Regions:
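Residue-level signal for tight coil/turn positions that link beta-strands
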Residues: 18, 67, 139, 160, ...
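Short, T/G/N/S-enriched strand-turn elements that build extracellular solenoid repeat scaffolds
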Residues: 7-16, 97, 101-104, 112, ...
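Solvent-exposed adhesion/ligand-recognition segments of exported proteins
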Residues: 25-153, 163-165, 169-171, 185-188, ...
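Extracellular beta-strand/loop-rich repeat segments of large surface/secreted proteins
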Residues: 1-36, 86-90, 194, 203, ...
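Secondary-structure transition/turn motif
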Residues: 72-79, 170, 209-210, 230-234, ...
């Protein structure tokens, strides 16, 4: 993790003046601290460094150089509507949000942010329909509950290292994107609406309930994280999701449509091969059951 004393990277010498984008992990960042990033002989200029990636969504970065070490000091980005506490609805008198430190109301179409911070309630109760343009989650352990629903073409982004549990039913249709190291726990079979989910890096999508037929289309084909089934969840997937790792909890079931799989599949659940031919080239370590389905007169091989 970053600190203010020791540079994250030390090199023998540094030269050049090309524009350089600095990307920082979000999990341990705080405002008002000068983080030591890079140290090396010849480092005297900070003007060509800029803040990029997920951190740039939330912070302004001021770079400086002292004694051959590059530092960045972060401040909250202005104009972001950040969750504070209370109930999420569209009432103009409901100031459950903060805009540059001022209690504020939410209106449909806005981009909203769920970040860690003093006085932030991680339990988000949704009342009625809400339709933000985009939801950015950078904090950890947020939980959405209530009788309300996220609707419209909303996109849901879990930035690197963020975590969110969705226990309410939603109908939003925009993409759901999980950044590296983030985790989305689905506690309601209708939580994802009609959204397509993209897993990036070491992100985790955990389905704890429901029957998820068609995972091969609900997940973006470029996904690379882990799909975890827990509770009483079950699902059917296809070989198209070549980069996804599957983790099956006890009492869960994953059915593989016919195809050739190079995926890692582990856990204590049940793995089923549907009618047709399945070839498993990946690491498969299941302590539950293996089942092969067959139809009279139809070939089925494992």
């Amino acid at each position: 993790s970053l600190d203010s004393e020791t540079a994250a990277l030390t090199v023998n010498s540094i030269s050049g003046s090309e524009a350089t984008e600095v990307r920082l992990g979000l999990s341990s960042l705080e405002t008002g601290i000068s983080y030591a990033l890079l140290s090396g002989a010849g480092l005297t200029e900070s003007s060509f460094f800029t803040l990029g990636g997920a951190a740039a969504e939330l912070y302004n970065g001021t770079f400086s150089v002292s004694n051959g070490t590059l530092y960045v000091n972060l401040s909250d980005k202005e104009g972001l509507l950040r969750w504070k506490s209370g109930t999420w609805n569209t009432e103009s008198s409901n100031t459950s949000w903060s805009l540059d430190g001022t209690p504020s109301a939410y209106a449909d179409g806005e981009t909203v942010y769920f970040s860690n911070g003093d006085g932030v309630d991680k339990n988000v109760t949704i009342a009625g329909n809400v339709a933000p343009g985009r939801i950015n989650v950078s904090g950890t352990d947020f939980i959405c509950t209530g009788d309300g629903s996220i609707t419209g073409d909303t996109t849901l982004n879990l930035l690197d290292g963020a975590s969110l549990t969705m226990n309410n039913a939603n109908s939003y249709a925009g993409d759901t994107v999980l950044g590296d190291g983030s985790k989305l726990v689905v506690g309601n079979a209708g939580a994802l609406g009609t959204s397509t989910v993209l897993l990036q890096g070491d992100s985790v999508l955990e389905l704890t309930t429901g029957t998820w037929n068609g995972l091969g289309t609900r997940l973006n084909v470029n996904s690379s994280g882990t799909l975890k089934l827990s509770g009483n969840a079950s699902g059917t997937t296809t070989a198209a999701l070549t980069g996804v790792r599957y983790e099956l909890g006890a009492n869960t079931t994953l059915t593989l449509s016919a195809g050739t799989y190079g995926n890692t599949i582990t856990g204590a659940g049940t793995l089923i091969s549907a009618v047709g031919t399945n070839v498993l080239n990946g690491n498969v370590d299941i302590t539950g059951e293996y089942r092969v389905l067959a139809t009279n007169g139809t070939a089925c091989t494992w």
